[in-house]
């Protein structure tokens, strides 16, 4: 089966069912990272992932890794940490700083090149991409970012520069997300870190069914307004 070459004149993607089995989920190549194309991709359960300087690759793996926010796993050690959590949390206060940190904190290299950062910052400016920041005093020590598609949040990356910063970020985000009607977090591909936090694999078809329904359930505007978030309320 051949991988589809995307047209520069159209934002139409092939069906995810046509994705390769090996490498798992590779569906298409080419195109660009303009906001309309990125949104068209996420609405169809497709995401970009490629090495900087190389052709853009588009993926929809099977199975798909997801996190149901209510199933977030909090370990005993994390519960002990929570009692004296030194951090404060904000939403959409420093998106560009978060995505830049996600790019630089990867020892094994990153796909988040300058063009990717610019593309997602544009999505953020349009109100589709969002970040959660973790602060120790006035220093950014952790965070995550992703793209909202109705009641689904497509998580892209997270980073941590202090103990449990990224785990705390996800805990606070899950609480805020569900409080405003969010139902599903797309983790794309399962790894040891996301699995330890409660992410599971589900069949791609089931994920696409959920996405097709939940993307038409937009969360209230106040969910994504820049704001400070209360860590203690997330633990109740």
Curated annotation (Swiss-Prot):
GO CC annotation: cytoplasm
Main location: cytoplasm
Enzyme class: transferase
Assigned keywords, A-Z: Acyltransferase, Cytoplasm, Transferase
GO MF term set: leucyl-tRNA--protein transferase activity
SUPFAM superfamilies: Acyl-CoA N-acyltransferases (Nat)
InterPro entries linked: Acyl_CoA_acyltransferase (IPR016181), Leu/Phe-tRNA_Trfase (IPR004616), Leu/Phe-tRNA_Trfase_C (IPR042203), Leu/Phe-tRNA_Trfase_N (IPR042221)
Annotated localization: Cytoplasm
GO biological process: protein catabolic process
Reactions accelerated catalytically: N-terminal L-lysyl-[protein] + L-leucyl-tRNA(Leu) = N-terminal L-leucyl-L-lysyl-[protein] + tRNA(Leu) + H(+); N-terminal L-arginyl-[protein] + L-leucyl-tRNA(Leu) = N-terminal L-leucyl-L-arginyl-[protein] + tRNA(Leu) + H(+); L-phenylalanyl-tRNA(Phe) + an N-terminal L-alpha-aminoacyl-[protein] = an N-terminal L-phenylalanyl-L-alpha-aminoacyl-[protein] + tRNA(Phe)
Annotated EC: 2.3.2.6
SS bond list: none
Domain of life of the native organism: Bacteria
Function statement: Functions in the N-end rule pathway of protein degradation where it conjugates Leu, Phe and, less efficiently, Met from aminoacyl-tRNAs to the N-termini of proteins containing an N-terminal arginine or lysine.
NCBIfam families reported for this sequence: aat
HAMAP family: Leu_Phe_trans
Protein family (similarity comment): Belongs to the L/F-transferase family.
Name of this chain's protein: Leucyl/phenylalanyl-tRNA--protein transferase
Gene symbol of the encoding locus: aat
């Amino acid at each position: 089966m051949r991988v589809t070459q995307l047209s520069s004149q159209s934002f139409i993607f092939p069906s995810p069912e046509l994705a390769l089995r090996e490498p798992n989920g590779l569906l298409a190549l080419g195109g660009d990272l303009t906001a309309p194309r990125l949104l068209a991709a996420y609405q169809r359960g497709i995401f970009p992932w490629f090495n900087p300087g190389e052709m853009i690759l588009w993926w929809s793996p099977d199975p798909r890794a997801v996190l149901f926010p209510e199933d977030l796993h909090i370990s005993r050690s994390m519960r002990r940490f929570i009692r004296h959590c030194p951090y404060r949390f904000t939403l959409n206060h420093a998106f560009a700083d978060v995505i830049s940190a996600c790019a630089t904190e990867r020892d094994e290299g990153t796909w988040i090149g300058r063009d990717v950062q610019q593309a997602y910052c544009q999505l953020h400016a349009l109100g589709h991409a969002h970040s959660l920041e973790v602060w120790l005093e006035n220093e950014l020590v952790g965070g995550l970012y992703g793209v909202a598609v109705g009641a689904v949040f497509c998580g892209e990356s997270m980073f941590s520069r202090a103990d449990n910063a990224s785990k705390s970020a996800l805990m606070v985000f899950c609480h805020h997300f569900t409080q405003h009607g969010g139902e599903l977090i797309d983790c794309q591909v399962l790894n040891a870190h996301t699995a330890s936090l409660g992410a599971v694999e589900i069949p791609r078809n089931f994920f696409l069914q959920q996405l097709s329904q939940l993307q038409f359930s937009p969360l209230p505007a106040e969910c994504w307004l820049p704001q400070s978030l209360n860590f203690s309320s997330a633990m109740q």
